[in-house]
A protein has these predicted regions:
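Residues forming the flavin
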Residues: 1-212
Length: 212
C-alpha cells in the first residue's frame, strides 16, 4: 500500500490485515498500465463507450461481450491494430484508426493484415480533439496535428460512433515509487536506475515494465 523513503513497507492481506515490514532491500516490480483518457487530456463529455484496447480485448476474448458496433480507434499500437481486425470480424464497423505520430506504432504485418485487408483507414499525424455524447459516445472529432503535436485548424473531421478505443501506449505504475521518494525519469515516468537497476535510494531496485 505504501513505501517510505526509509524502506518501511505498509502492506495488507486477508489473514493479517494491515501490517508493516522494515526491509533491507526492496525490488519495485509493479508493472505498467494502459494510458487512460485522463492521461491523454482529451476534451469533451465523459460518456460510456470509451475503452482501452486491452480492456476491449478482454471483453471480447474472455467475456464474450461486444463493446460497441461503430468504432473509432486512437493509436496504432499492435493491440489497437489487432482489435481493429477483431472488432471487424465480430461484426463491428471500424470507421478509422487515428495515430498522433507520423508513423504507426505497430508492426508492418499488423498494418497489412489488420487494416489494409479490411479497408480500414489509418490517419497518421491525427488525434481525437473532441468526444460527443452524454450517456453514450455518439461521435468523435479528429484533426491533423503539426510537428508540435497541436491540432491544425481547418482539418477537423467528425465520425459518428458508439465506441472509442484507446491504444496509446503504456505508463509505469509509479505511485509506490513516488511515495518512496525515488527519482523518476521525466521521459519514461519510471524510476531512474544505475547499471545494477538500483534507484536513487540505496537498497531500492526496479525492474521490468515499471522502468519503461
Amino acid at each position: 500500500m505504501d513505501i517510505s523513503h526509509k524502506k518501511k513497507i505498509t502492506a495488507m492481506n486477508r489473514k493479517d490485515g494491515m501490517f508493516e515490514i522494515q526491509a533491507k532491500a526492496i525490488i519495485l516490480a509493479m508493472g505498467c498500465r494502459e494510458r487512460s483518457r485522463g492521461a491523454l487530456n482529451i476534451p469533451g463529455y465523459r460518456p460510456a463507450g470509451i475503452y482501452s484496447a486491452g480492456t476491449a480485448q478482454r471483453l471480447v476474448n474472455m467475456e464474450g461481450y461486444m463493446p460497441g458496433r461503430e468504432v473509432v480507434i486512437l493509436g496504432s499500437g499492435d493491440i489497437g491494430l489487432i482489435m481493429a481486425r477483431r472488432m471487424t470480424l465480430e461484426g463491428a464497423k471500424v470507421k478509422v484508426v487515428a495515430e498522433l505520430m507520423p508513423y504507426s506504432g505497430g508492426l508492418k504485418r499488423n498494418i497489412v493484415q489488420c487494416l489494409n485487408d479490411f479497408d480500414i483507414p489509418l490517419k497518421l499525424s491525427h488525434t481525437v480533439i473532441d468526444i460527443e455524447g452524454k450517456e453514450r459516445v455518439t461521435g468523435v472529432t479528429i484533426a491533423e496535428v503539426g510537428s508540435d503535436g497541436r491540432p491544425i485548424a481547418g482539418t477537423e473531421e467528425y465520425y459518428s460512433c458508439d465506441t472509442l478505443l484507446l491504444s496509446c501506449g503504456l505508463i509505469p505504475e509509479n505511485e509506490l515509487s513516488r511515495s518512496a521518494g525515488v527519482t523518476l525519469n521525466p521521459v519514461t515516468s519510471g524510476p531512474v536506475v544505475n547499471d545494477s537497476l538500483e534507484t536513487s535510494i540505496s537498497g531500492v531496485f526496479a525492474c521490468g515494465n515499471v522502468l519503461h
